[in-house]
Amino acid sequence: MSSINIALDGPAAAGKSTIAKRVASRLSMIYVDTGAMYRAITYKYLQNGKPENFDYLINNTKLELTYDEVKGQRILLDNQDVTDYLRENDVTHHVSYVASKEPVRSFAVKIQKELAAKKGIVMDGRDIGTVVLPDAELKVYMIASVAERAERRQKENEQRGIESNLEQLKEEIEARDHYDMNREISPLQKAEDAITLDTTGKSIEEVTNEILSLL
C-alpha cells in the first residue's frame, strides 16, 4: 500500500492513534502521529513560560520525527527527544489552545504534507482529510461516546502513571470537542468524502478490520 495515503480524523480519545498504528502495521505503511507534533510545540510553549508571540516561538523551533523499531515514532524538539513528556496533564490542558494558533498550524501542516508527499502514510488528527491530505485515497472520521472516550483516556493515563478523575475527564473531553469544532483555523470537521466510523463498544481489532475492509 505504498501508493496511497490514509487519513483518520476525529475528536479527542476516539481511538485514532491506536487504530492508525495498527492499520499502518498491517499494511506495512508509515504512521504519523500529528497530535504528538502539536503536543511537542505545546511542551515548548509551557517550558518557555507561555509566551504569546507564537511567530517567534515557531521561528526558533526545530521539530523532527524519527522511527524506532521498538518504541515507534519519536519526536525530537530542538534536537531533544521529548516523546515521553507529551502526555503530561499540563500539555493536554493547553494543546488545543496552542494548536489553534496560525503560526503553529502552518508550521506543523507543512511538515505533515512533506511527510505524506511520498505516499504510504497513515496519518491521524483533526484536519487531516480536510486540510493536510485532502486527496487521501481513504478518509475515515472516527467517533465514540464521551463516556467511552473518557474511560479510554483514563486507562491511557493509568498506564502512564498519570492520576485522573473520570468525571473530570468527561468534562474536559466535552470542552475540547467544543473548542476544536469552533476554532477559526482548521476546525474539527468531517471531510465530505470521509466515511464515519463509530468505535463505541468495539475492540481495536474490530475497528482495524472495518477500516481495512474499506480499501
From Swiss-Prot:
Record's subcellular location: Cytoplasm
| Example of a GO MF term | dCMP kinase activity
Where, in this chain's numbering, is ATP bound? G10, P11, A12, A13, A14, G15, K16, S17, T18
Domain of life according to the entry: Bacteria
Task: Quote the InterPro entries the UniProt record gives.
Answer: Cytidylate_kin, Cytidylate_kinase_dom, P-loop_NTPase
Catalysed reaction per UniProt?
Answer: CMP + ATP = CDP + ADP; dCMP + ATP = dCDP + ADP
- Per the UniProt entry, what is one GO biological process? pyrimidine nucleotide metabolic process
| Assigned EC number | 2.7.4.25
Q: Which GO terms describe its cellular component?
A: cytosol
Q: Which CDD domains match?
A: CMPK
Question: What keywords is this UniProt entry annotated with?
Answer: ATP-binding, Cytoplasm, Kinase, Nucleotide-binding, Transferase
Database matches in PANTHER family? CYTIDYLATE KINASE, CYTIDYLATE KINASE/PANTOATE-BETA-ALANINE LIGASE
Q: Which family does it belong to?
A: Belongs to the cytidylate kinase family. Type 1 subfamily.
Q: This chain belongs to which protein, by name? A: Cytidylate kinase
Q: Which organism is it from?
A: Staphylococcus epidermidis (strain ATCC 35984 / DSM 28319 / BCRC 17069 / CCUG 31568 / BM 3577 / RP62A)
Q: What is the lineage of its organism?
A: Bacteria, Bacillati, Bacillota, Bacilli, Bacillales
Gene name of this polypeptide: cmk
